[in-house]
Amino acid sequence: VPYRPTDHLIANKEETDMRRTAVLAGMLALTTPAMAQVTRFEVTEDVPAFAGRSFGEVGGYRRITARATISLDPADPRNAVIADLGMAPRNAEGRVEATADVVILRPEELARGSGTLLLDVPNRGRKLAPQLFDDSPQPGANNLRAADDAGTGFLVGRGTTMVWVGWQADIPSAPGQLALTAPVLQGVTGAVREEFVFDHRRNPAPATLAWNIADPAGLSVTVRQVWSDSRQVPEGLSARALDARRIEVSRPAQGFDAGALYEVTYTARDPAVLGMGFAAVRDVVSFLRRDSSATNPLVSSGRPGVHRAIGFGVSQSGRFLRDFLHLGFNEDTSGRIVFDGLMPHVAGARRMATNLRFGQPGRNARHPQDPAWQADTFPFTYAVLEDPVSGRRDGLMLRCRLSSTCPRIMQTDSEHEWWASRASLLVTDPAGHHLDLPPDVRAYMIAGTPHFANPGETLGRIEAAALPKNPMHAGPPMRALLATMEAWLAEGVEPPTSRVPMRAHGTLVPAGVAMPATIPGLPYAGIHTPAAHSDHSVRAPRELGRYPVFVPLLDRDGMAVAGVRALQLVVPRASYTGWNPRAEGFGPAALYPLQGAVVPFAATREVRVASGDPRPSLAERYADDAAYIAAVRSAAEAAVAERLLLPRDAEALAARAAAGRLDQLR
C-alpha cells in the first residue's frame, strides 16, 4: 500500500456529501450486524474541523462525534479476562453492553490521507496528542474547531486519521471529556484505600473519592510524613463525608507538613465494570479499520480508508496501553491484530489498576505515595521473565506472542519517569541485571525533560517544589519518532536503536553514585521511587519484597548522559533535570510530582567561581552568540541524520536559538 495515496482524490466526495446531508437532517444512527462487537455506531455530529482550514495536499478535515455501543459475550475467552463481566446485567442476547464516546478527525477526502489511524487514548477524557505533536495549546487541542487548534499542523499535514475512544467508566461523559458508559453492579460493596497529598495548608482539606461511600460511619483516615513511616492517628485528625463522593479531612495542628500523606479507607458501593474500557478500544478500532459497511465513517469507495493503526497514549493513557497489551486486547474477537504499532508515552514501568473491582484508573501513585500500588506490579517490561519476588512468570508481550498479534512497540519516556516511575525496570530483570529489549521493541528516554510540559512554557516556580520547574517540551523528538514508527510499519524501515540508560553501558546506576559533582543551586539527594511487591489482600498492604531500581548517570552539569538528548542538552545554557525535590514544608524528602528542574549557568567565569559552581560559564563555553548558534545548527544536523529530529524542527530550533529563546529561560 503506498504511504500516501494520491490517485482517486475525489472518489469519496459524493459519499462525504451524503453523510453530511444525513447528519444535517438529524442523526446518523446505523446498526451493524449482530455478530459484531460494535453493534451500533451513532454519528451525532459531522462538521468541518479547524474552521475549514486546509492542509496542503491533504486538504481539509472533518470532525466526527459519535457513540459506539459494544456488545460482549462473557463466554468468549477474549472477553473472559474482564473482571466482573460475568456479573454484569445482560441484554436479550445474553451479552453485556457498554457505550463509548468517540471523536474522529479524518481527511475530508480519505484518499488524500496517509492510511494511518492514530488512536490517542484519552487521558482522563482529554485529547493530548495534538498538544504534544502539534504544539497545540489547551483548550484548543481538545476542541479541534478553530483554525489555530491545529497548532503546527504536523499530524493533519501528514494526512493522519485521528481517533479518540472513551474508555474510562468512572468519569462522566461531558463536552471535552470522553467516557464510557458501562454496567454498574448495583448493591455490590467492597473495601477501598486511597491516598492524598494536599500540598497546601488549608484545614480542613477537601477531597473527592473514586467511588460512592456505602457507609459514612466506616470512613477512616491515617497520616504519615512518607509512605515508609508508620500510619498514625494523632489528635485532631478526622474525616467526614460531605456527600456520596466528597469528604473533608481535618488535619492535626502539628507534627506534619503540607506534603504529608493521608490514607483514607472506606467501604464503597456500586462498582462499574471498568475493564470493558479495554474492549471498547479494541472493538472500535477493529471496526473502524475493517468494517466495510456504510456504518463506518472511515469507509471510502466501499472499503476502509485506513491501512494501519497506531495506539498512542500519554501518562495514564500510556499505562492503559501497557495493560491493554498485557491483558491480550491487541487480539480482536476474530483473532486479528488491533494495533500494528503501540507508542506508550511517559508510562515508565507502570500499568494501571483498572481491570479489577473498585479499580482506580485515574490514580497515579506519586512519590511519596504507595510504591506497591496495584498498578505498579510485575511484569514491568515486554520480555517474558521469571520473577523471584512474586514467584510469577510473565511479560507484557506474553499473550500477544501466543496469539501472533504483537505490535511493534516504541515506548517513549521523559527523564522524569526514570526517577519517579521506575523506568529502569524496562531494561533490567527483577534482580537488577541488564536486559535486552525484544527486537520488535524500542525504548527512548527524552533526556532532560519533565513528565509533560506545555509548548511555549518558560522557566517558572511552584511553591511546593524546591527548584525552578523544567519547561522543556518533548514535541520535536516525539514528532521524529512518530515519523519513524510510521516508516517502520508502512515501509519496514527499522527505527533508530533504543536510546535509554542501560546497566551494560554503565549509564544506568545506583542513585547514590549518579551525580559526579556538587552543584550549588542543584541539590542532589538521590531521591527516586522504589519498587515494592506487597500483599494487597489485607486492608493495610504488607510489603513482601523490593526490586532494584536504578537511575540515569549524570554528567558534570547534572544532566543525563544517555537517551535522546535535545539540543538544549547538547548545546546547553542551563542544567535540565528530570527530577525536582519538594520544598521545605512540603515533604522535602520526596520528589515533587511530574516536574524536572532547570538551573541556568553563570554568565562568566568570575561569577561561577564566586558561587562555587563547577559548571563552565556561558562565556567559557561559547566565544560569542554566533558560536553558540553555529553549535546549535551543527547539533541539529546530527540529530536529523540520526532520525531523532525532523528537518523542519531543526530549522525552527536553530531560529529560536538565534532569537535567544531555545533555552526557554525567559
Label each PLM-derived region with a short phrase:
Residues 32-36:
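Sec/Tat signal peptide C-region and signal peptidase I cleavage site
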Residues 14, 37-666:
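C-terminal His-loop and adjacent cap/lid subdomain of alpha/beta-hydrolase
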